Amino acid sequence: EDALRRSVRELVADGAESFAVCLLWAFRNAEHEERVATICEEVAPGIPISLSHQIAPKMGEFERAVTTVINAYIGPLTQEYIGDLDRGLAADGLANSIQVITSTGGAARAANVGQQAVSIVNSGPVGGLVAARFLGDQLGHDKIITADMGGTSFDVGLIDGNTLEEDPRPFLDQGLPVTLPAVKLITIGAGGGSIAWTDGYRLHVGPQSAGANPGPAAY
């Protein structure tokens, strides 16, 4: 535990803004991860902590670790942004707390999204699939292909028989595996601003993007 305290101090000194904790068998017994979290809170109070047994309590330490790290990376910013939005809308008279669509096509309360930020990864294209299914139902179509093109990726989804297929092994468009329920999408790094680059003798496209200033909303 003394070594852990030293490591936490070093991370804070290096500018760490969030912690991700993933121990091998934590999905079966969370005691050690919870102890690590307690020590982190003692040494560095106020820094957000993502624990793998809370984020993705499944076998497969690599996928669980990646999922936890992604949550720790995007969690604080997501919580701040959605929290500001929720409070701003409430101040303008919105009676109910907002809900945010998730990668399963469902919705989560804004208050919970910051703790499980990874659950909204790829939720934009999934939201398009949900909307397409609704529209298809109104028009009498149950076989639909959707396409969602952004600045960094091109996402394709399929609706067959009015159902959304669950992805048994979801990956982000950067090739990172996540171990959470998600609607199946096929993603390629060919967005509107994707940059082609070489790494030795290999050609890559994205995920770097040239961006847009002003954005498409101003066109």
Task: Identify the role of each PLM range.
Residues E1-Y219:
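N-terminally biased helix-coil "hinge/interface" segments that flank
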